[in-house]
């Protein structure tokens, strides 16, 4: 149900930009709904990816354990390279990119809580797996937004984690006994039918910080919930990164690894990036036709999230029909959520009959 609401709230990244631009224009009325989504006629008339993609049109992800400085490095890399920075997708990522950008209640965001996971990871109400399932969907949505931006503008993107590294948390949760084997099977089923449609990043940057140092940083940060994270859980995350994620990604893309000290020198990291040849991975096999189909997919957020809801009964992520109907109607009553963006009078939309 929550994923259904995520689909309802998700809109094309380019459509969001168009709508925002239309709201800023003064004078002659212009509609945020006028521009048609990219389609076959655009392609046939010459709007092709090869015209805007350059050697700097790259997808870069920055990965690492909790509190390793991923956000700082990703932001600095993006600024130095002239790329667009995508901060790590959290529970409220769909909220931040739709409506007024304000976080909605838990009922509309997977009914999960990161704070509760840290406080009670073995909670018998299924919060741990609901959280992981929802975060995968949020990262999937963000990755589609990043690819859409790349294919639409040609500008490179830098993300903090991605759908390709999300599983490290699932592995750690299962190893620590936080979730059941059935949850792992459900996750892998969803992942297998969604991730196959997406190209991996051109480059993965991994910040390697030992678990004791991670714990020291967590304590220094002072978040009362994060301070309850065990060293065993952090070690399992690190193991999943080093034993599975990095070996797999090294076959698909470039990989750079840095220590905590080395990662602080973003200038040196950028120099290393510029020396890379980017001579491996599926991006090299793409042409205008395949990138056309990829762009069609990533601009359609309903299709992006379609297979995150699969017909498998799992108590952790399943709710009854009556509750589904109630939450859906409550969601539709929220300001700006009843109709498509630009058609809701309660949030100030005007000239609706001309759109």
Swiss-Prot record:
Q: Keywords of this protein's UniProt record, alphabetized? A: Electron transport, FAD, Flavoprotein, Mitochondrion, Phosphoprotein, Respiratory chain, Transit peptide, Transport
The UniProt entry, under InterPro entries, shows: Deoxyribonucleoside_kinase, DNK_dom, NDUFA10, P-loop_NTPase
Entry's SUPFAM superfamilies? P-loop containing nucleoside triphosphate hydrolases
GO CC annotations on file: cytoplasm; mitochondrial matrix; respiratory chain complex I
Is Transcription found in the keyword set? no
> Transit peptide boundaries, per UniProt?
1-35
Q: How is the cofactor bound?
A: Binds 1 FAD per subunit.
Q: Which Pfam families match?
A: dNK
Keyword Cell membrane assigned? no
**What residue range is the signal peptide?**
none
Q: How is it modified after translation?
A: Phosphorylation at Ser-250 by PINK1 is required for the binding and/or reduction of the complex I substrate ubiquinone.
The primary site where this protein sits is mitochondrion
Q: Which residues are modified to Phosphoserine? A: 250
N6-succinyllysine modified-residue sites: 285
Q: Where in the cell is it found?
A: Mitochondrion matrix
Tree of life domain: Eukaryota
For this chain's UniProt record, which GO biological process terms are given? mitochondrial electron transport, NADH to ubiquinone
Identify which cofactors the protein needs according to its UniProt entry.
Answer: FAD
Q: Family per UniProt? A: Belongs to the complex I NDUFA10 subunit family.
Subunit comment: Complex I is composed of 45 different subunits. This a component of the hydrophobic protein fraction.
Q: State the function annotated in the UniProt record.
A: Accessory subunit of the mitochondrial membrane respiratory chain NADH dehydrogenase (Complex I), that is believed not to be involved in catalysis. Complex I functions in the transfer of electrons from NADH to the respiratory chain. The immediate electron acceptor for the enzyme is believed to be ubiquinone.
This protein is called what?
Answer: NADH dehydrogenase [ubiquinone] 1 alpha subcomplex subunit 10, mitochondrial
Organism whose genome encodes this protein: Gorilla gorilla gorilla (Western lowland gorilla)
């Amino acid at each position: 149900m929550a994923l259904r609401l995520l689909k309802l709230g998700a809109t094309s990244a380019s459509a969001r930009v168009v709508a925002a631009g239309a709201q800023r224009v003064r004078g002659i009325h212009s509609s945020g709904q006028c521009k048609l989504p990219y389609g076959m006629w655009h392609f046939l008339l010459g709007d092709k990816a090869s015209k805007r993609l350059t050697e700097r049109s790259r997808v870069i992800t920055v990965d690492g354990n909790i509190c390793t400085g991923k956000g700082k490095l990703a932001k600095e890399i993006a600024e130095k390279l002239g790329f667009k920075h995508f901060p790590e997708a959290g529970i409220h990522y769909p909220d931040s990119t739709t409506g007024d950008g304000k976080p909605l209640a838990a009922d509309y965001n997977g009914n999960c809580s990161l704070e509760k996971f840290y406080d009670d990871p073995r909670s018998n109400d299924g919060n741990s797996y609901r959280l992981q399932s929802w975060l995968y969907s949020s990262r999937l949505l963000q990755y589609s937004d990043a690819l859409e931006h790349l294919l639409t503008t040609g500008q490179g993107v830098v993300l903090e984690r991605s759908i390709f590294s999300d599983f490290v948390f699932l592995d750690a949760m299962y190893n620590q006994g936080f979730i059941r084997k059935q949850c792992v099977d459900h996750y892998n089923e969803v992942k297998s039918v969604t991730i196959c449609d997406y190209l991996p990043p051109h480059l993965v940057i991994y910040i390697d910080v030992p678990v004791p140092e991670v714990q020291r940083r967590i304590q220094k940060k002072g978040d009362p919930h994060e301070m309850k994270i065990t060293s065993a859980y952090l070690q399992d995350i690190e193991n999943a990164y080093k034993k599975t994620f990095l070996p797999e990604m090294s076959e698909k893309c470039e990989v750079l690894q840095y220590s905590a000290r080395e990662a602080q020198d973003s200038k040196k990291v950028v120099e290393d990036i510029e020396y890379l040849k980017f001579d491996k991975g599926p991006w090299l096999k793409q042409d205008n036709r395949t990138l056309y189909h990829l762009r069609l997919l990533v601009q359609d957020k309903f299709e992006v999230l379609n297979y995150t809801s699969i017909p498998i009964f799992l108590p952790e992520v399943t709710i009854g029909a009556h509750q589904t109907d109630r939450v859906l109607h409550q969601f539709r009553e929220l300001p700006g959520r009843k109709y498509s963006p630009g058609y809701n009078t309660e949030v100030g939309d005007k000239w609706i009959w001309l759109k």
